[in-house]
C-alpha cells in the first residue's frame, strides 16, 4: 500500500493502515541511524524547509537530521530571524518560499489550523511539526513506535496520559493515533486542564485521579504544564500540582511491572516527573528522542512519494 497524502497535518486524518505503514517504514529506516556513515541517497535533490514560528530543540533538530540522512538539502528558518518580525504574513512567507521551489515545508506554528491554511496555498508537501494546541503528528508517531517496539503491538495497551490535556497538542495526536490502533487511553489532570467531551475522540476514559489512570497501565505518559498557552493561572501552585499529578516511584508502582514511562519533553523535573523516575530503567524518554529521527525520516520519505520500504 502506498501513502496517498501529499501532506501530513494530523493523525486524525490517517487510517490504521497508513499509521502502520509509517511505523513500519520508520522501523526499517532506523537501521540507517546505527551505521557508521548515517546517510542514504533516497531524497537526493529534494529541498526541505524547516519553518519554525515557535521554539524547538528536539523536533527541529531531528527533522533536520532526518532530511540530511536521506540526503535532502535542509534549510532552517525561525520566526525571530525571518521577515515575520517585519510584519510579513504567513501567506506572503509561503508564496516567497514556494517561489524557491522547495519540495517539503515542515512548519511549527502557534495558531491551530495554520498548516491546513498553508497546505491549501502551496503545491509542495506540508508536514505539521506542531500547531497551537491542535496536533503534533510526528510526536504521536514516535510515541507509538516506542510503545510498539517495547510491547510488540499497540492493540489492547492501556496508556495513561497525565497532565495538562487541554493545552497539549501531543495529547491529541497520541489519543487519535493510539485509539485508531486499538489502545485504550486513560486521562488524568486538573479539572481546569481537562477538555470537556474529550472522551468523544475515541476509546478514552477520563479518571478522577492520577492513581486510577496509572493502575495496571502499560505506558505512563507525563505531560508538562503548558504555561505559554494559558491566558491565566489555572493552578494554586506547582507544589500542589506535583502532589496530585506528579509521577514518583510510589505512583509508578501501581502500573504493570514492565510498564514504561514516557514524556515528550522538555521535562520539568520535580513537577510532573521525579528525577528518580525520569532516569529509572523503566524510562523510555531517550528512546523516544532516538525514534524521532527515524519517524521523521519516514514522514519525509512518504510525502515525497516513497514506496514501502522492505
Curated annotation (Swiss-Prot):
Q: Enumerate the residues binding carbamoyl phosphate.
A: 58-59, 108, 136, 139, 265-266
Q: Which Gene3D superfamilies match?
A: Aspartate/ornithine carbamoyltransferase
Residue sites binding L-aspartate per the record: 86, 169, 224
Q: In which pathway does it act?
A: Pyrimidine metabolism; UMP biosynthesis via de novo pathway; (S)-dihydroorotate from bicarbonate: step 2/3
Q: Which EC numbers does the record give? A: 2.1.3.2
Is Transferase found in the keyword set? yes
Alphabetical UniProt keywords: Pyrimidine biosynthesis, Transferase
Which Pfam family is one of those matched by this entry? Answer: OTCace
Q: Give GO BP annotations, semicolon-separated.
A: 'de novo' pyrimidine nucleobase biosynthetic process; 'de novo' UMP biosynthetic process; amino acid metabolic process
Cellular component annotations (GO), alphabetically ordered? cytosol
Q: Name one GO molecular function term.
A: aspartate carbamoyltransferase activity
Q: Which reaction does it catalyse?
A: carbamoyl phosphate + L-aspartate = N-carbamoyl-L-aspartate + phosphate + H(+)
User: What HAMAP family does UniProt report for this protein, alphabetically?
Assistant: Asp_carb_tr (MF_00001)
Under PANTHER family, the record lists: ASPARTATE CARBAMOYLTRANSFERASE, ORNITHINE CARBAMOYLTRANSFERASE, MITOCHONDRIAL
Q: How does it assemble?
A: Heterododecamer (2C3:3R2) of six catalytic PyrB chains organized as two trimers (C3), and six regulatory PyrI chains organized as three dimers (R2).
Report the protein's function: Catalyzes the condensation of carbamoyl phosphate and aspartate to form carbamoyl aspartate and inorganic phosphate, the committed step in the de novo pyrimidine nucleotide biosynthesis pathway.
Q: What NCBIfam families does the annotation carry? A: asp_carb_tr (TIGR00670), PRK00856.1 (NF002032)
Family (UniProt) = Belongs to the aspartate/ornithine carbamoyltransferase superfamily. ATCase family.
Q: What is the recorded name of this protein? A: Aspartate carbamoyltransferase catalytic subunit
What is the species listed in this Swiss-Prot or TrEMBL entry? Citrifermentans bemidjiense (strain ATCC BAA-1014 / DSM 16622 / JCM 12645 / Bem) (Geobacter bemidjiensis)
Amino acid at each position: 500500500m502506498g501513502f496517498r497524502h501529499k501532506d501530513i497535518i494530523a493523525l486524525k486524518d490517517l487510517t490504521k493502515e497508513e499509521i502502520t505503514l509509517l511505523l513500519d517504514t520508520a522501523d526499517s529506516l532506523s537501521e540507517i541511524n546505527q551505521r557508521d556513515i548515517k546517510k542514504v541517497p533516497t531524497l537526493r535533490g529534494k529541498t526541505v524547509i524547516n519553518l519554525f514560528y515557535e521554539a524547538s530543540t528536539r523536533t527541529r533538530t531531528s527533522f533536520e537530521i532526518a532530511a540530511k540522512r536521506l540526503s535532502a538539502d535542509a534549510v532552517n528558518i525561525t520566526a525571530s530571524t525571518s521577515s515575520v518580525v517585519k510584519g510579513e504574513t504567513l501567506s506572503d512567507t509561503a508564496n516567497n518560499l514556494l517561489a524557491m521551489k522547495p519540495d517539503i515545508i515542515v512548519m511549527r506554528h502557534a495558531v491551530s489550523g495554520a498548516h491546513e491554511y498553508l497546505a491549501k496555498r502551496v503545491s509542495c508537501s506540508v508536514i505539521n511539526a506542531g500547531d497551537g494546541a491542535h496536533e503534533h503528528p510526528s510526536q504521536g508517531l514516535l510515541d507509538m513506535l516506542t510503545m510498539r517496539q517495547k510491547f510488540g503491538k499497540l492493540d489492547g495497551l492501556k496508556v495513561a496520559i497525565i497532565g495538562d490535556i487541554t493545552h497539549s497538542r501531543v495529547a491529541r495526536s497520541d489519543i487519535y493515533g493510539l485509539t485508531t490502533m486499538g489502545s485504550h487511553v486513560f486521562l488524568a489532570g486538573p479539572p481546569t486542564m481537562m477538555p470537556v467531551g474529550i472522551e468523544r475522540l475515541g476509546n478514552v476514559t477520563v479518571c478522577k485521579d492520577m492513581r486510577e489512570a496509572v493502575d495496571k497501565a502499560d505506558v505512563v505518559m507525563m505531560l508538562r504544564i503548558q504555561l505559554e498557552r494559558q491566558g491565566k493561572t489555572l493552578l494554586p501552585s506547582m507544589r500542589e500540582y506535583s502532589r496530585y499529578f506528579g509521577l514518583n516511584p510510589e505512583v509508578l508502582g501501581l502500573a504493570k511491572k514492565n510498564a514504561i514511562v514516557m514524556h515528550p519533553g522538555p521535562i520539568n523535573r520535580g513537577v510532573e516527573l521525579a528525577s528518580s523516575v525520569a532516569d529509572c530503567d523503566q524510562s523510555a524518554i531517550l528512546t523516544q528522542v532516538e525514534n524521532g529521527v527515524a519517524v521523521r525520516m519516514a514522514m519525509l520519505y512518504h510525502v515525497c512519494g516513497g514506496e514501502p520500504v522492505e
